[in-house]
Amino acid sequence: WLTGLFLALLALFMMTGARAFLAWPMYESLLSTLPLYGFLALGLTLVVAAGEMDLCFPSTLAVAGFGFALTGIHTGQVWLGVIVAILIGLGIGLCNGFLVAYVGVPSIIATIGTQFFWRGAVMLLSQGLALGLADLGGSPMHSVLAGRLGGFLPMQSLWLIVMALALWLLLNRHPLGDAIRFTGEQADIASRLGINVPAARLGVHTLMGGIAGFAGAIGCMEMGSWWPTQGDGYMLLVFAAVFIGG
């Protein structure tokens, strides 16, 4: 019924505000910005499926974006910056997963703490200053990840579809997906069935970090800059996408 309500409202807006709602630039704007939330929501879905929580991803996105920006500025290589951003995200996610799976800190507490730590760290390292990345806009990798297909369709919207399909297959057609869901539903029984519960928890947090790192790089490429508060305000919308959108 939510889909029906959305379509009804969209039809109403199109009839009453045709100049705005029938113009492609508005939808191009949506398709260029909403994938960032979508990437994060996909990663968080796996974390929640494992019975865990991650509140660190906005800060992970900012730190990874900072790594992407510095790498791009100093080397001029967008592809290398993307790799650095993903590796930074994986590292932060690995730390979160280790705290949760092997130290025994509840995930909500662990990731709240690491969120503040990494946000403070990136503020300190950047001295609160933004970084301009306009010179990276013409590279082939930029065109592949955040360019415009046919001059109008944002590439990140296509990458969101690719990631959604890949993670759906992982969760529903792969033994790792079974381990994640069993861990989330009943960890004790999953352990008795031979599932490595700590490894499953470590894996989802690490993957969430890597996805946040990728989103950080995409965000920098789309905006043409990095800013210290990157990721602020994302948490509520991402949680809404996961828990309300299902």
Model segments located where?
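Single transmembrane alpha-helix segments in multi-pass membrane proteins
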Residues: 8-74, 98-105, 243-246
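Transmembrane helix-bundle core of multi-pass membrane transporters
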Residues: 103, 107-174, 200-203, 222-231
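Hydrophobic alpha-helical transmembrane segments
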Residues: 3-4, 30, 37-38, 59-63, ...
